[in-house]
Amino acid sequence: MNPVTVFFVVVVTVAVCMILFQVYSIYLNYDNIKEFNAMHSPLEYSKMVNVTAIDRRVQDANDDIYDAKQKWRCVKFDDSYVSLSMFGYKADGVGIRRFRTLNGCIDYTFSTSTHSSILNPCIPPNDPKSRECTFLKSAL
């Protein structure tokens, strides 16, 4: 074999070994990776340090907001999902807009709704001690 062939064989061998080391490292830390993902999943749609944001479209409700409490997110409330931020809940005209699935909430919040009503149960004339207000404060 000539020196060029030996060089390329060594480079390919090193590359394959590096890939195998990475796969083995992921295998060893898989439980830690799952725990990290579970812990940081509420921040999935927030722009935070070292956390990437997932955009469902080119422009969404969180693109121009840098305060994490002001960002819209989907949270399970009772047996349904609601879209909330520190401004309140996305409303359907009468009350809080509820979704049966998390994907339905995400699709509406980050794709469908650009201008929708917002209901804040913590400001008058609403009761600041209501269940909805308490949940809103605890979710933020």
Curated annotation (Swiss-Prot):
Q: Where in the cell is it found?
A: Virion membrane
Where mainly located? Answer: virion
Entry's Gene Ontology cellular component terms: membrane; viral envelope; virion membrane
Provide the alphabetized UniProt keywords: Disulfide bond, Fusion of virus membrane with host membrane, Late protein, Membrane, Signal-anchor, Transmembrane, Transmembrane helix, Viral envelope protein, Viral penetration into host cytoplasm, Virion, Virus entry into host cell
Q: Which InterPro entries match?
A: Poxvirus_A28 (IPR007664)
What residue ranges lie in the Virion surface compartment? 22-140
KW Transmembrane helix (keyword) present:
yes
- Kindly list the residue ranges recorded as spanning the membrane: 1-21
* Post-translational modification comment from the UniProt entry: Contains two intramolecular disulfide bonds. They are created by the viral disulfide bond formation pathway, a poxvirus-specific pathway that operates on the cytoplasmic side of the MV membranes.
Q: Which GO terms describe its biological process?
A: membrane fusion involved in viral entry into host cell; symbiont entry into host cell
Q: How does it sit in the membrane?
A: Single-pass type II membrane protein
**What exactly does this protein do?**
Envelope protein required for virus entry into host cell and for cell-cell fusion (syncytium formation).
Q: Which family does it belong to?
A: Belongs to the poxviridae A28 protein family.
Protein name in UniProt: Envelope protein A28 homolog
Report the source organism.
Myxoma virus (strain Lausanne) (MYXV)
